[in-house]
Design a protein with these regions (language model features):
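Conserved, well-structured ligand/cofactor-binding cores
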Residues: 1-183
Length: 183
C-alpha cells in the first residue's frame, strides 16, 4: 500500500494533501510528517484496513534529519549528472569549435579599462574553455560528498531504533534506482 500510494503521489496525484509552505524548520519535519500522515491515511484506504501508522510503518527507521538531506543530495546528484555536466560538455565542445574557426585572428587584449597586448582570439577562447573544464572537474570531484546519504542515523545521528545495516540497504536501493554511486 505504501509503495502504491507513493507512486501515485510521485505521478502528481493527491497534491492537494500537501499544503505546507517551503519556509519551515531546517529539518523539514512538517513536510516529512505531512507526507507520512498522507501516505498512511491513503494507504489504509487503499488496503481497506487500518494497517499503516504514520510513524511506526511509513516513517520506520527514518528521521526528517535523514530524509531531507538525503532527498536533497539525490536531487542535486541527479541534476548535476543529467543536466549540468552534459551542458558543460556541450559548452566546452562549442568553445573548442569556435577556437578552431577563429584560429589566426588577432585581437587586442584588455586589462582593466585599457588596451593591452595583442593575442589570438582562439587563445582568449581557450582560456574560457579551460576555466569551464576546471570547474567541471571540481564539480565532479565534489560529487563524492553529494553521494554520501544521511540514511539510518535517525534524529540525532546515533542510529537508535534503526535496524543494523538499514543505511546500506537503503543506499544500495537508491543507487540501483538512480544509477548513481550513493553510499
Amino acid at each position: 500500500a505504501i509503495v502504491e500510494i507513493c507512486q501515485r503521489i510521485e505521478n502528481g496525484h493527491y497534491l492537494d494533501q500537501f499544503p505546507l509552505h517551503v519556509w519551515q524548520t531546517g529539518s523539514g519535519t512538517q513536510t516529512n510528517m505531512n507526507a507520512n500522515e498522507v501516505i498512511s491515511m491513503l494507504g489504509n484506504e487503499y488496503a481497506k484496513e487500518n494497517i499503516l501508522h504514520p510513524n511506526d510503518t511509513v516513517n520506520a527507521s527514518q528521521s526528517s534529519n535523514d530524509t531531507f538531506p538525503a532527498a536533497l543530495h539525490i536531487m542535486v546528484a541527479q541534476k548535476i549528472n543529467a543536466e549540468l555536466l552534459p551542458q558543460l560538455d556541450l559548452m566546452i565542445h562549442q568553445i573548442k569549435k569556435l577556437e578552431e574557426e577563429n584560429e589566426g585572428i588577432i585581437k587586442i587584449g584588455r586589462t582593466h579599462l585599457q588596451d593591452a597586448t595583442p593575442l589570438y582570439f582562439s587563445q582568449e577562447l581557450s582560456g574560457y574553455r579551460s576555466m569551464i573544464e576546471h570547474s567541471k572537474a571540481q564539480i565532479i570531484d565534489s560529487l563524492k560528498y553529494v553521494y554520501e546519504l544521511a540514511c539510518g542515523a535517525t534524529a540525532v545521528g546515533t542510529g537508535i531504533n534503526c535496524p543494523e545495516g538499514f543505511d546500506e540497504v537503503v543506499t544500495k536501493i537508491i543507487s540501483e534506482k538512480t544509477h548513481l554511486p550513493f553510499v
